[in-house]
């Protein structure tokens, strides 16, 4: 069975930098520990995605269309994050960081001026910041195992909330059956975001009806 856009599938994957085989993305907890990448705040295990809807990096997402359920693939992506842009490398005085009680060191990722940057070097009272994507200019390889297609609307909707709204599973609860569902959320979200979610959900699950409810005991923002 070939995968189509808007199909919900369960997958496992490992993403590696082609030049040195270093792992940067994965779903396997044991491998994360072995590679010293384990993060106790990260959710490991098979992931449910909606194909073609940006749940993965664009080049990988597009590459899944036409693949077969139950098979494993090695997918090479040529420079998916674009070339490095030298204008995105900035030099700042170390005093700017000490004022914010930040001790900069090479490899540290920080939010600067609303953008994610990586500290490349610290010397002579200066800090070199790189605002390029950490994988800019690199070819990568994903080893993808396509476990199964997901048909259950409840599982689809849970995955859609996590992937589209960026909400952790312990921050919401989806209830309902067949085509009618309620999403209980701990913190209210803007109406525009709710409407956008419903619109996107209707595109990929045209038969369902969704309403948001603030969980009992939560404070409406």
Task: Show the residue positions of the predicted features.
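FKBP-type peptidyl-prolyl cis-trans isomerases
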Residues: 1-221
